């Protein structure tokens, strides 16, 4: 749960018990609700920095005593004792913003007999008759209540202390496909559809470029107008073909456009993207590769996905439509397919093309990714996975926009297939350790 909820969040827990879990996630605003007066008294005594309310979470009248909106709403094992899960979910919308995440955690139905045996033998606290819901049941109830599933996860294959191997098995074996469906704990993360609305947003298009002189003016000419304001940011990467001079020429040639030109301080696309994003003034941040193999004409689709609220992180995909001949080398294509399967599993959201350069998100979400970058560290020279992993850590809703990948018309690829392939393999292992092999 501490992985899903960043420290300093506003958290509402329904069925908080003694308040232990709520205190562990270290919220700036923590509100716990429970129907048991004894539990509420214990929680208030143990965690005076948090707020606890004694009421029935299924009663709208009693829940009126809880005010405000929250970043996370947690139901940990609570759905097992609810009379009507769907109605309870429906009553949560008033606590939700567009950024709120509902987290439902529960024991898997498969473990029911063993848990009852543990109660009989005194190894687990007895509970009343439970709703033994499968993950699919929880997903269905949330969708009926107008919530959209962001991702699902499964944890804890065996008790931690079992023969001293519990932690090892749970970290390094339990997350694998097939095995994970046998885990004790299910997690479903969802967001409110009722909180979504279409907004007109300003846009910053960041174009990192190294030795792309012939693509600078076409990038400006081919970029459609969309958003309440459009800013174009060229970030030059120490080129040797006059790219920087061409950027300045184009900036002077189109004074009616908001064009900015800067030179990156370090090396690599990731460094260039971070410099551009940190400078950007738009509410929506976009990456457009200067080779223009991703058609600039497709960017309004990415914008619409963000502005409509349908997605919070939009990734391009070159692997859906047929490509132009020579647009992608065979080995690159195989690598993309392989890494896409791996990252779909690692991130619990669908990714068909992690290496597509075009990625779009709100600046407010990017700032959260940047603030939490210490969790992953400075590991990614590409910049793609810094954003993808950060979005996964924030539980952002991901969508992919298929694009028709075109051949280069100027310059040569900046990608060294084998060196970058080795780095990508290292990132898979890194992601497994940071996203799957959790304590």
Residue ranges and their predicted role:
Residues 18-59:
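Class I SAM-dependent methyltransferase SAM/SAH-binding core
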Residues 53, 244-279:
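Conserved donor nucleotide-binding strand/loop of the catalytic core
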Residues 86-98:
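A short glycine-rich, Lys/Arg-flanked "PGG" loop and its adjoining helix->strand segment in the class I
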Residues 99-106:
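Conserved beta-strand signature within the Rossmann-like core of class I S-adenosyl-L-methionine
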Residues 111-131, 264-279, 296-377, 381, ...:
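Acceptor/aglycone-binding surface of glycosyltransferases and processive sugar-polymer synthases
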Residues 170-203, 207, 212-214, 218-225, ...:
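Hydrophobic helical membrane-anchoring modules
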Residues 236-245:
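A conserved acidic beta->alpha catalytic loop
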Residues 285:
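Short aromatic/hydrophobic "clamp" motif used to bind/position activated sugar donors
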């Amino acid at each position: 749960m501490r992985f899903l909820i960043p420290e300093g969040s506003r958290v509402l827990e329904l069925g908080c018990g003694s308040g232990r879990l709520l205190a562990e996630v270290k919220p700036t605003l923590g509100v716990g609700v429970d129907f048991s007066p004894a539990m509420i008294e214990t929680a208030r005594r143990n965690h005076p920095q948090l707020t606890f309310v004694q009421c029935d979470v299924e009663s709208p009248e009693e829940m009126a005593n809880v005010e405000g909106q929250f970043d996370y709403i947690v139901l940990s094992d609570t759905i097992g004792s609810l009379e009507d899960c769907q109605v309870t979910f429906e009553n949560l919308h008033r606590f939700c913003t567009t950024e709120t995440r509902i987290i439902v955690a529960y024991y898997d139905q498969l473990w029911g007999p063993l848990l009852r045996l543990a109660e009989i033998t005194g190894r687990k606290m007895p509970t009343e008759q439970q709703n033994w819901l499968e993950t699919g049941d929880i997903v269905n109830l949330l969708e009926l209540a107008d919530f959209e599933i962001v991702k699902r996860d499964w944890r804890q294959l065996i008790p931690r202390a079992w023969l001293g191997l519990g932690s090892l098995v749970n970290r390094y074996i339990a997350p694998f496909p097939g095995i994970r469906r046998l885990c004790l704990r299910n997690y479903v993360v969802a967001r409110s559809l009722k909180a979504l609305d279409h907004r007109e947003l300003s846009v910053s298009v960041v174009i990192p470029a190294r030795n792309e002189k012939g693509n600078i003016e076409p990038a400006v000419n081919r970029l459609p107008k969309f958003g309440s304001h459009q800013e174009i940011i060229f970030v030059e990467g120490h080129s040797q073909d006059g790219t920087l001079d061409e950027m300045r020429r184009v900036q002077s040639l189109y004074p009616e456009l908001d064009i900015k030109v800067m030179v990156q301080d370090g090396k690599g696309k990731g460094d260039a993207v971070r410099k551009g994003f940190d400078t950007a003034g738009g509410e929506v941040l976009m990456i457009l590769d200067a080779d223009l193999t991703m058609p600039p004409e497709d960017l309004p689709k990415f914008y619409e996905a963000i502005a409509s609220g349908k997605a919070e992180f939009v990734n391009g995909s070159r692997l859906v439509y047929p490509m132009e001949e020579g647009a992608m080398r065979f080995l690159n294509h195989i690598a993309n397919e392989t890494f896409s399967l791996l990252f779909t599993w690692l991130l619990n959201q669908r990714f068909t093309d992690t290496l597509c350069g075009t990625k779009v998100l709100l600046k407010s979400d990017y700032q959260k990714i940047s603030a939490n970058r210490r969790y992953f560290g400075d590991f990614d020279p590409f910049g793609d996975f810094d954003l993808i992993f950060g979005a996964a850590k924030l539980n952002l809703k991901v969508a992919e926009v298929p694009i028709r990948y075109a051949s280069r018309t100027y310059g040569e690829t900046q990608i060294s297939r084998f060196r970058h392939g080795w780095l990508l393999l290292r990132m898979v292992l890194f992601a497994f350790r940071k996203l799957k092999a959790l304590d």
